[in-house]
Amino acid sequence: DPRFNPKYPTIYDYGYGTPAGTLGINCMHELYPYVEGVTINRQKHYDEQEAIRNGEIQQMQRYYERQVRKWKQRKLAAERIGNTNLEAKCSSAIRRYQSKIRKIVSENDFLTRQYDREKIANI
């Protein structure tokens, strides 16, 4: 193609046409035409450090959600064997982690409470 500029890598250099490459499986990239000297990048720019901090906070939320599920499973097992002391301990742990989730969500506007992540399958 005579319009190709060797100054820029082609889309094929980034795995276009392969599942792991650009526009492959689960790829959310979008293609836009680019004309040198004319095109202006209007995409939203993100602060890298803020994104890392937000990711760490979100990881903490996911940890709390995993703990809620773990303690709910233990509580279910305690109910099935009739251990009321363990049930009370599990209920307390569940409330403690749910409280931590409420706190972290209220302190960070980019987070939302996702109750389905706290549910367990009743087997």
From Swiss-Prot:
Pfam families: Phage_min_cap2 (PF06152). GO terms for cellular component: virion component. InterPro entries: Phage_A118_VSP1. Transmembrane segments: none annotated. The keyword Cell wall biogenesis/degradation does not apply. Keywords: Virion. This is Structural protein. It is found in: Virion. It comes from the Viruses. Belongs to the Lactobacillus delbrueckii bacteriophages ORF1 protein family. It comes from Lactococcus phage mv4 (Lactococcus delbrueckii bacteriophage mv4). Its main location: virion. One of its GO terms (molecular function) is structural molecule activity.
